[in-house]
């Protein structure tokens, strides 16, 4: 498993992974449309295949993870990519890392909290507002849970 910074040469692979997992290269988060083709981050490769990506943006004194996507689970890909975001926050003298997930994403809530993140807040109804901007957002998410709220998690340096 190798990690490489997203650059001009490999951006298309980052974009492909993001589009595969988010069905678009634009996401709506915190009532903002985010162009994922402009995000900094890292890719993970294994045996020549791109299997994971993490992207982030600068949010003042915090680094904000905008995507963490992996094609494999249980092999440490997500953990290694998330560690890169934490390291970037430290190197850039940030106070920490923030990210948003949705109320249906139980696996993500488990994943992030067992890696030092805690819930900072819940924006009730945020996904409904996002759906007005991006109508392709489904009404139901994982486990047929109604997709309604954004949950912000934070890790402090």
Model-predicted regions and their roles:
Residues 1-3:
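Extreme N-terminal starter segment of soluble prokaryotic enzymes
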Residues 8, 144-157:
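Glyoxalase I/VOC metalloenzyme domain signal
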Residues 25, 32-36, 47, 55, ...:
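Conserved acyl-donor/pantetheine-binding loop and adjacent beta-alpha core of acyl/acetyltransferases
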Residues 89-101:
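Conserved GNAT acetyl-CoA-binding A-motif
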């Amino acid at each position: 498993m190798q990690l490489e910074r997203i650059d001009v040469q490999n951006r298309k692979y980052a974009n492909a992974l993001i589009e595969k997992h988010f069905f678009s290269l634009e996401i709506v988060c915190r009532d903002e449309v985010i162009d994922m083709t402009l995000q900094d981050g890292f890719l993970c490769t294994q045996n020549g295949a791109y299997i994971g990506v993490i992207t982030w943006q600068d949010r003042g004194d915090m680094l904000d993870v905008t995507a963490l996507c992996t094609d494999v689970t249980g092999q440490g890909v997500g953990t290694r990519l998330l560690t890169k975001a934490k390291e970037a926050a430290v190197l850039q003298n940030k106070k920490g890392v923030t990210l948003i997930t949705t109320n249906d994403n139980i696996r993500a809530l488990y994943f992030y909290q067992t890696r030092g993140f805690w819930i900072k807040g819940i924006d009730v109804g945020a996904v409904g507002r996002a759906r007005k901007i991006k109508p392709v957002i489904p009404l139901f998410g994982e486990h047929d849970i109604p997709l309604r709220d954004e949950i912000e998690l934070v890790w402090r340096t």
